[in-house]
């Protein structure tokens, strides 16, 4: 099988080809043991993210932000977003609050995914300055969510939101309507790259 897939279905096509073979190896936040993820597991997690994004009402080509260091969750989020034809905007893990505010406002971001405590704290502060930002989704369960913060949830709770979409065919409809013109990712730079 030749793999020449649109990003919206790439991981699923690779899972059909490679199934139970290892796709990724990673360490959890603060972990010391390597963990393995098969192509089938990777595909399953990507589908769950896609379903949860649809449950939130993420539209075609809507921009979502990821503010985290590299992690397995980051990959699930990217491919899950592309699975519903959303566009991801990565924010470097040490991005300043001023830069975050500019990007969130300029791109009209409603949802931001955060890695660790520092990223969550910045996102929470910036949320008060950005009227479009509705929800903060946190990868690391050890992050302490601020008291009286109903707009932030942990990634595993976010995934549960998608259960209402499971089996509805909505993700597949988005994937079938994907085009090569879809934006996948927008990278903001400091302007010093030339």
Regions found by a protein language model. Give the residues of each.
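AMP-dependent adenylate-forming
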Residues: 11-37, 143-146
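AMP-binding/adenylate-forming domain of the ANL superfamily
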Residues: 1-25, 44-45, 63
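Conserved AMP-binding/adenylate-forming core of the ANL superfamily
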Residues: 24-79, 96-101, 154-163, 177
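Conserved adenylation A10 loop of the ANL superfamily
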Residues: 30-31, 186-194
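Structural core segment of the AMP-binding/adenylate-forming
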Residues: 83-161
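Hydrophobic/aromatic ligand-binding patch that stacks against planar heteroaromatic rings
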Residues: 80, 126, 188
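Conserved pre-ATP/AMP-binding loop-to-beta segment of ANL
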Residues: 19-22, 153, 160-188
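Helix N-cap/beta->alpha junction signal
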Residues: 68-70, 116, 182
């Amino acid at each position: 099988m030749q793999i020449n897939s649109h990003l919206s279905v790439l991981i699923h096509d690779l899972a059909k080809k490679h199934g139970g073979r290892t796709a990724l190896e990673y360490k959890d936040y603060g972990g010391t043991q390597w963990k393995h993820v098969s192509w089938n597991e990777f595909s399953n997690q990507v589908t769950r993210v896609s379903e949860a994004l649809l449950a939130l009402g993420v539209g075609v080509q809507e921009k979502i932000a990821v503010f985290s260091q590299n992690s397995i969750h980051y990959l699930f989020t990217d491919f899950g977003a592309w699975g519903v034809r959303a566009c991801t905007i990565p924010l470097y893990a040490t991005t300043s609050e001023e830069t975050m505010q500019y990007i969130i406002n300029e791109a009209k971001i409603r949802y931001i995914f955060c890695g660790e405590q520092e990223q969550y704290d910045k996102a929470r502060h910036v949320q008060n300055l950005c009227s479009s930002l509705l929800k903060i989704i946190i990868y690391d369960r050890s992050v302490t969510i601020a008291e009286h913060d109903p707009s932030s949830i942990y990634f595993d709770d976010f995934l549960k939101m998608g259960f209402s979409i499971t089996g509805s065919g909505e993700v597949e409809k988005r994937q079938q309507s994907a085009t090569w013109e879809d934006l996948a990712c927008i990278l903001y730079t400091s302007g010093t790259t030339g």
